[in-house]
Amino acid sequence: MITVALIDDHLIVRSGFAQLLGLEPDLQVVAEFGSGREALAGLPGRGVQVCICDISMPDISGLELLSQLPKGMATIMLSVHDSPALVEQALNAGARGFLSKRCSPDELIAAVHTVATGGCYLTPDIAIKLASGRQDPLTKRERQVAEKLAQGMAVKEIAAELGLSPKTVHVHRANLMEKLGVSNDVELARRMFDGW
């Protein structure tokens, strides 16, 4: 029997996943948590083998939570976003799988079985995005803006240097941050210096 925990701040997602997993004779959902803090308090000692964890939660992000979960538990990250940068971030943080919230029931079940037996699971569409995302995900202009932001330049300075309007620089900044899965200039600089 493979024991599973669900961590998601949306009750309907947890309930739906629990019902789907409960239909499988070798899977048992033994814990459900509505927040990262609840999971940290309730997971230890439950003997959970596989954890399905949402990335976007209000108290602690799933990526932050990943490093604090009990050792020996295989974690599948779950998100509505599946940009290559976000998937890579999750895998680098120790996730053994990544599912989009648009995944099929069969993909959910396959992911749990795969990570429970030591494998890594990505749906084919995410794997393709990840493989193609290993090429530079940014346009030439987005890369220029990213490099300037990482050097600490202000938007107005970047606009003047590249011959763009500040509004255009803001658009490039928003696009590149979404593509790289970062939310501020500090995270962006860290990604730049780590070689993406």
From Swiss-Prot:
It holds the Pfam family Response_reg. One of its GO terms (biological process) is phosphorelay signal transduction system. Residues 155-174 bind DNA. InterPro entries: CheY-like_superfamily, Sig_transdc_resp-reg_C-effctor, Sig_transdc_resp-reg_receiver, Tscrpt_reg_LuxR_C, WalR-like. Phosphorylation by UhpB enhances DNA binding activity. It is found in: Cytoplasm. One of its GO terms (cellular component) is cytoplasm. Residues 131-196 form the HTH luxR-type domain. Its main location: cytoplasm. Keywords: Activator, Cytoplasm, DNA-binding, Phosphoprotein, Transcription, Transcription regulation, Two-component regulatory system. PANTHER family: TRANSCRIPTIONAL REGULATORY PROTEIN UHPA, TWO-COMPONENT RESPONSE REGULATOR. This is Transcriptional regulatory protein UhpA. It comes from Escherichia coli (strain K12). The lineage of its organism: Bacteria, Pseudomonadati, Pseudomonadota, Gammaproteobacteria, Enterobacterales.
